[in-house]
A protein has these predicted regions:
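Alpha-helical assembly-interface signal, strongest on the long, hydrophobic N-terminal helix that forms
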Residues: 2-70
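Short amphipathic secondary-structure patches
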Residues: 55-102, 115
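Low-complexity, S/T/G/P-rich flexible repeat/linker segments used as non-globular hinges
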Residues: 2-3, 104-120
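Short, structured secondary-structure boundary patches
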Residues: 31-34, 96-112
Length: 120
């Protein structure tokens, strides 16, 4: 009988250790999820900026807006807080690549825009 009492006494306080472990795991998962969601938001931001820059460059290349197509794409990219890495502006189609620094990684996004008949 004393043996059963001794085992029960040796586990006293283990519930609080288990609770701390569960809370720690939950906080770790929440922090990791926040980082993943922030990276996804930054990637979406880069893609939106690439799309806007490509559309602006396509409008400029088609002659609807006066000026340099890649210069216009760089200006739009800068307004969105990203860096223009590449711009290939033709009369009917424009390709744009932008990058965004997110902590220790660099996110890149590409976009293509052009006249309705030229882009499938």
């Amino acid at each position: 009988m004393s043996r059963v009492v001794w085992c029960a006494r040796s586990e006293r306080g283990s519930g609080s250790v288990l609770a701390v472990a569960i809370i720690g795991a939950t906080v770790s998962i929440a922090v990791a999820l926040c980082l993943v969601l922030a990276a996804h938001a930054a990637n979406t931001r880069a893609q939106v900026a690439a799309d806007a820059a490509a559309l602006a460059a396509a409008d400029t290349a088609s002659g609807r807006i006066p000026g340099d197509a890649c210069g216009r794409a760089a200006a739009i990219a800068a307004e969105h807080g990203v860096t223009l890495n590449g711009c290939d502006a033709g009369r009917t189609e424009t390709f744009v690549t932008v990058s965004l620094d997110f902590g220790w990684i660099t996110l890149t996004a590409s976009s293509r825009a052009g006249l309705p008949d030229s882009v499938p």
